[in-house]
Amino acid sequence: TLALIGSPVAHAIEPRYLLAIGLLLIAIGAGGIKPCVSTNVGDQFGETNRHLLTRVFNWFYFSINAGSFASTLLIPWLLDPYKAELGGFIAKLPPAIVGFLESPRLHSPDVAFGLPGVFMAIATIIFWMGRKKFVHIPPVGLRTYAREIFNKETGKIILNILIPVPFIAIFWALWQQNFSSWIVQAESMDRHLFGIEWLSSQIQTVNPIFILIMLPLFSYWLYPFVERFVRLTPLRKIGAGLFVTAASFFLVAIIQTQIDGGARPSIIWQVWAFVILTAGETLVSPTHLEFSYTQGPVKLKSLIMCTYLFAISLGNQFTAAVNFFIQNPDGSVKLQGASYFMFFVWVMLGTAVLFAIVTPFYKGRTYLQDQTQVAADAEPAVGFAVQPEA
């Protein structure tokens, strides 16, 4: 649908309606796919290999960011007109290739948004072809599902799992701003880096790059090292990530102070802020996926995984509410420049401190698929619980 914005169809339907339809379909697709995909990942593990869950969710998040890296680098390039620099590597290629890369037809919304759709279709086909290679947990049926949801004990479990969500939502309120306020800030910075003038929207490409580096680094080195001295539970990782995220916004606030003073700092400073932000993301995001999966009752895994998306949604709503309430009637804003970023620093610090106070009282249980059921791959999983790990 988004690809049609640059096509003749846009003359018959207003682009804003096409955009709204495309976003609605993305929301429906993401809401259906994401909780089920992450649940399917966890369902491959039972009691005998439960120690691998942390790493597998890290690798799952790794694969997500590999796609994010490709899209954030490629889509802005496909949306903008392109002209090869004289004397550059591209200009030295055969004329036919240069002509193709510079073609206005290539650099258009229908290609920029249509190409990911093609890749999504290919991925769907490959996934379907490999459906017999992984464990399936059969649906329990509507009656059983309803009985589980409206069970008093299940209600207590769900409410318990929701405790960290508001805190993690504030993390997402900050993190998502690398797509908005950080891009606006980059417009006022010197974006020459490695001999290239980067688009302000391309700087965020470093985030998935750093994620691809940090996920295995944290999983195979940092976490085992810290475990020698401190028991590193999921909630402790998340708490540490909240403090780290506040530090990233503090650096961005310092950068903005320089900009407000008339300076034009190098974009490398924002890259360093991305290093810190990505470290916080590595601690919080895949850990929340793992936490949500392990704490959810076996018949409600996909539903519980929705709490991950719920936290992201709450974070976006919080930022939108802040941006609404800081508006003055005359069009000015109460928070601008460095003060805007410092507001989020203090909010994040307060959230992190409160999280550290609340979470020691969290009493959870780890629920995994019954190993015999996973091996048989036949009956609805009955599951079992082991003692608290969160």
Model-predicted segments: where are they?
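Intracellular juxtamembrane helix-capping segments at the cytosolic ends
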Residues: G32-E47, F274, E281-G296
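A gly/Pro-rich, aromatic-decorated transmembrane alpha-helix motif that marks the paired
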Residues: I5-P8, A66-P81, E85-F89, F250-A253, ...
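Intracellular loop-helix junctions on the cytosolic face of multi-pass helical membrane proteins
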Residues: F45-T54, N58, S63, I75-T205, ...
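Helical-face signature of the major facilitator-like transporter fold
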Residues: L23-I28, I168, W172, P208, ...
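Hydrophobic or amphipathic alpha-helical targeting/insertion segments
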Residues: T1-C36, N40-Q44, L78-K83, S108-G130
